[in-house]
Amino acid sequence: LVGSEMCIRDRENLHSNNPCMNENKKKIAFIINPISGTQSKEQILKWLDEKLDKERYAQEVIYTERAGHAVEIAAQKAQEDAHAVIAIGGDGTINEIARSLVHTKTALGIIPCGSGNGLARHLQIPMEPKKAIDIINDGLIDIIDYGKINDVPFFCTCGVGFDAFVSLQFSKAGRRGPLTYLEKTLLESLKYRPETYELEMDGSTLRYKAFLIACGNASQYGNNAYIAPQATLNDGLLDVTILEPFTVLDVPSLSFQLFNKTIDQNSRIKTFRCQTLRIHRSKPGVVHFDGDPMMMGENVDVKIMKKGLQVIVPRDAEKDTSNVLQRAQDYINGLKQINDAFVEDIAHKNKMILDKGKRQFKKLTKM
């Protein structure tokens, strides 16, 4: 199913309404990344057919076919004055769609299907697709800020240093998902060396030796890992988090606070807010924007763009409805993922050692 010429149909012809014949209805385009996450996209289409309000909306379903395809599709839908473009995918798909909708009348909607789902989580959009469809029917349209890193838009977080390096390694991995990300994080953290950065912001200059520098428009990377827990999407400011060099003894507290929304209280963390930030480093390297890696030069300019994107959000969403029990559950879930990754990594290393021992034993027995 290709591009903009398709009128509301999918592979199973589930959708009987044709947007070309329903001019009075609000037009919504659903852009699906077929390879994101593990959720069945065909099942999501069935739920759409069952739950979407067909009296109000004429829907169109389009599959992406390559990297960057969602940018093109969303731009065309914005030109056609679609009411909304709904991303069915992960943070990368959301970024591609949202960058084409900034400063237009077309709103972004999200049915999260990715590994992290950072923006969806910050907006309190349910992780269950059926409930996310309810938000499209009953939600409100809010206007949020977005950021740019060397003129590349981001909507959740961007950064340099270790998190960007891990994003690069993760993009090369055959497997996807949170456990793969944690595995890469644990393995690479043993080898990664902090760099020295010069930061210019709002008229002042500072130097830091840092493990990573994260700039948050939203509060989290995804999977409820809150790198900028105080960040909001409509304050016109970047929340900058600097993680200074640390020891292995700091890892438990950093992990605890990352998932408990209190990492800004750690002694190894420095935070500040600004509208613009220039990061100068000694050599070109990788950066990340919304979890996707990109190579950039020595100078990295980050800035906030105020109130540039319309998004569909839950009607009853508040600025922060989390409570102590929810934070505790988030932390437990986070620790379980870390523990699972540790166990998987240890088992893998033990297997490698065992295999090596077997090979050496065979060599010795042949002598």
Regions found by a protein language model. Give the residues of each.
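Glycine-rich beta-strand-to-loop/alpha-helix junction loops that act as flexible
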Residues: P34, I88-G90, C113
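Short glycine/serine/threonine-rich phosphate/pyrophosphate-binding segments
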Residues: A70, G92-I97, G118
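Glycine-rich phosphate/pyrophosphate-binding beta-alpha loops
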Residues: G159, A214-A228, P293
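Gly/Ser/Thr-rich active-site loops/lids in small-molecule metabolic enzymes
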Residues: G174-T180, P229-D250
